[in-house]
Regions:
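Conserved class I S-adenosyl-L-methionine
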Residues: 45-54
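Conserved beta-strand signature within the Rossmann-like core of class I S-adenosyl-L-methionine
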Residues: 151-158
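Conserved SAM-binding loop of SAM-dependent methyltransferases across substrates and taxa
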Residues: 55-67
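Class I S-adenosyl-L-methionine
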Residues: 162-201
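S-adenosyl-L-methionine
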Residues: 2-46, 82-109
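Mobile active-site "lid"/loop adjacent to the S-adenosyl-L-methionine
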Residues: 121-140
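Conserved SAM-binding motif I beta-strand of class I
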Residues: 70-75
Length: 201
């Protein structure tokens, strides 16, 4: 049943990705690509980190795919923790009301994590002045690489459409320039969100 569910989800995502991309639909298309990667990589007993839980949508998508695993979520806003707990149906998760830059020392799970997801920017529907910043994000990426198992992956959605997001985008790309990573875009608009994937081999 688990495998059939994955196949069904992938088919739905493929249909969405095959549609003509417009800037208005860009965020949704990027999210579909993120979801595609999540489905492709996860196994039932995997350990996962949601480094920016926000309103919990990524965590809610991931948890049914890891019924024998565990998800660890991080966010500096208590509102995000509350919102996420409200929508999660599963119980195999632990949420921390602290910055993702503290995940290495908090979890002590080096070489154990299968997937880490970052959805940068601000909490949708909340105070837009509270945003992720490149310093803590880069530290979290560095620590995340240590936490990944030998086939682990990091997914980072970046939003360069606002000042702080553009700075974060530039700094992260500069940090990654000598590392193995891939960038997924579906528009030439430099302000549009895009996805970075980092694989550990």
């Amino acid at each position: 049943l688990w495998s059939l569910k994955k196949i069904s989800l992938l088919n739905d995502i493929d249909k969405c990705l095959a549609k003509r991309n417009t800037f208005q639909g860009f965020n949704k298309t990027i999210q579909n690509k993120v979801n595609q990667k999540i489905i492709e990589y996860l196994k039932p007993n995997d350990l996962v980190i949601d480094a920016t839980i926000g309103n919990g949508h990524d965590s809610a998508f991931i948890l049914p795919l890891i019924p024998k695993g565990h998800l660890y979520g991080f966010d500096i806003q208590e509102e995000a923790i509350t919102n996420t707990k409200r929508i999660l149906k599963e119980t195999n998760y632990t949420l921390y009301n602290i910055s993702h830059e503290n995940m290495l020392e908090t979890l002590k799970l080096e070489n154990k994590i299968s997937l880490i997801i970052f959805n940068l920017g601000y909490l949708p529907g909340s105070n837009k002045e509270i945003k992720t910043n490149y310093k803590s994000t880069i530290k979290a990426i560095k620590d995340g690489i240590k936490l990944l198992n030998n086939k682990g992956i990091i997914l980072i959605t970046i939003y360069p459409g606002h000042k702080e997001g553009l700075e974060e985008s530039i700094k992260i790309n500069d940090f990654l320039k000598n590392m193995n990573h891939n960038i997924y875009r579906n528009t030439d608009n430099p302000k549009a969100p895009y996805l970075i994937t980092i694989k550990k081999f």
